[in-house]
Amino acid sequence: MKNLKAKGLRIDGVGMQSHNGLDYPNLDEYEKSIDAFAACGVKVLITELDINVLPNPQGFGGADIAQNFELQQKYNPYTAGLPADKEKELNKRWMDLFKIYYKHRDQIGRVTLWGVCDENSWLNGWPIKGRTNYALLFDRQYQAKPVVNDIIKLFK
């Protein structure tokens, strides 16, 4: 980005695609990326935000949408609902991310989620079709998950 700006190109913002998991990306590195982009004098746009709660096949990596794996129960363990411990872990991850966004609210122009409710998350069909994921802030009945209230309180 510095090279482009040095050539006189106007750059107003940069998007950080944020398909996250319960344990990735490393939050310190994620926050450093926000700082690094903001240091270039642009607004940071958090894009495609979701959190994958499901295990991925060994050898899986990146975002190659052509990459598909066979459905196996071990990669789809929460068809009857998210267990309380996983829900707690997911809520903590949402809050950890939104605490970073709040801390850097002067540097971040917007946060865009990659969908509205769990029913329609792309992660139900990729990288394994037919899975049940809980990747968004609204459940399958379009009801806000409890963590939404915590996020709202954070920004008040």
Predicted regions and their residues:
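Acidic/histidine-rich catalytic cores of soluble enzymes
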Residues: 1-20, 24-27, 37-46
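Aromatic-rich peripheral "rim/lid" segments of glycoside hydrolase catalytic domains that contact
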Residues: 25-45, 51-156
